[in-house]
Amino acid sequence: MAQVDFIETTLGELVGAAQAYKAKGWRFAQCCASRNGDDAFELLYSFVDDATNEVANLRVCVTSADEIPSVGGIYPVAFMFENEIHDLYGLTVVDMNLDYRGGFYHLHIPAPMAQAPQGKAKPVAAAKPAAAAE
């Protein structure tokens, strides 16, 4: 069974950690964000060693005021994930190798995932069967 690690890190350590994984031959698998409070977000960067199937997840906690350094200079494919984080969460990623400047997704609401939930969802009424033909 593959080992999966979750490692707490900081914005200041993020680029150096990505460089270390690149130097060891690990691939960048993904980066995602989640809203973790009123102005708190969690970023998760995943790296994989294909030889051993080991996975390392770097966890970084940020606020909307933070500037997130891009790892795109190390792993060029990161531009997709970083643009997604910017567009969906409104977070600032600096020094992206390909910056869509908010146009990666065409959204009706700016940064929809950064918005606080608007209350409990209302249940959808069950569909009523159509009346039988006479």
Which ranges hold each PLM region?
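Terminal low-complexity/charged segments
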Residues: M1-E134
